[in-house]
Amino acid sequence: MSRESLYISACHPYEGSMAENHTHWLRKENTDQTKASFPELFFDLVFVFALIQLSESLSDDFSLGIAAEAVLFIFALWWVWIHTTWVMDLLDTEIEPVRLLLFTLMFFGIVMAIALPEAFKGMGLLFAVAYSAMQVSRSLFALYAFRRGDPASFMTFFRITAWLTISSTFWITGGLSEPHLRVVLWIVALVVEYTGPTVRYWVPLIGASPRETLDIDGEHLAERSALFVIIALGETILTIGKHTFSNLETEGTPWVLCFSFLTTVLMWWIYFHDGQQRAADKAEDTSKPQTTAQYLFTYGHLPIVGGIIFTAVGEDFSLAHPYQLGTYNFALAQLGGPILFLAGTMWMKRVSSRVLPYSHVFGISLLTASFTLVPFVANFAIQALTGVILLVVAVWEYVALKHLRRSAA
């Protein structure tokens, strides 16, 4: 008998009616859970607040150091959200224990978001404890829910819990440390968390999780990921509206408003017009749903979300200082955000259809080349150029897809 079998035998000593005590917390087989539930949507509101906190922190002081810290926070926020989404994909979110879990995670999430702007100052420990509480408590709940369910899934969550417990020690130790060491320890914590799925949460003595152990609903994960993109775009709209109102008397604000709104709409179009549905179809139809979902959503959506957040910060700069000559610091957000976004959507479309969207390659190339113009043009011109380049990408892809469909017909 393998070591893993011994662990399973120890954790499943009883059969019969007791199995029903916890397995009814799980999503029922053959149940259509494609649509996000109301408890999940309610949970997402915490991340609206968290993204606003992050965006405003960046807008207040966009130095290279602050930008690096923001990248760390984007990795952390995305990881805690996508892990929660995976767990909710397996559980029945309409029953009370699972709803109570979501409400508990919401509370920890609010505390985490409150601490976020000062996480590298006086609130590091609060941020670390709240983040770790979300990760570990959710994983322990899933472990308990699967205790009388599928043994392979139970062991997968046993491994995940072990990995998240290790990463939490780095988070909390970092929260107790001085800022320079805190950065290092929190980076180590994120490396641990992001490495886990790639090595299938290998644990000494019991090894790695078998492939495709979790009975996930790929279409549900696709919708949830798309909703997070909507959250990020919504935060962008809030930023545009707030800072347009704050700068109404500044000459050039109406033009920057138009180009900022155009940029945001085009990001929506590039993601949703074709790519999101293709990703959902791929996740639903593949013979390897768990692996495909990791490529498309767990890792693939991170640059999409990060790109939208940085684009919002760049739009804020352009609205606040439309006629100021560009700087490379600001351009990291103004041009780097759309580059990240296009890279992420290109990856998603490549994985889901095995066709490389050359329009995205062209757009990334133009945006990268635009860095050479930064010191010579004003912020509003950089914003306008970004909007025009994304428009070219969107029109190119639209025409190319229309041609492909005609050819296929």
UniProtKB/Swiss-Prot annotation:
Membrane spanning residue stretches: 62-82, 100-120, 123-143, 152-172, 183-203, 252-272, 293-313, 328-348, 355-375, 376-396
Membrane topology of the entry: Multi-pass membrane protein
Pfam families: LtrA
Keyword Cell wall biogenesis/degradation in record: no
Record keywords: Cell membrane, Membrane, Plasmid, Transmembrane, Transmembrane helix
Cellular component aspect of the GO annotation: plasma membrane
Disulfide bonds: none
Keyword Electron transport part of the UniProt annotation: no
InterPro entries hit by this protein: Low_temperature_requirement_A
Record's subcellular location: Cell membrane
Highest taxon of source: Bacteria
Annotated PANTHER family: BLL5714 PROTEIN
Protein name listed in UniProt: Uncharacterized protein RA0937
Organism of provenance: Rhizobium meliloti (strain 1021)
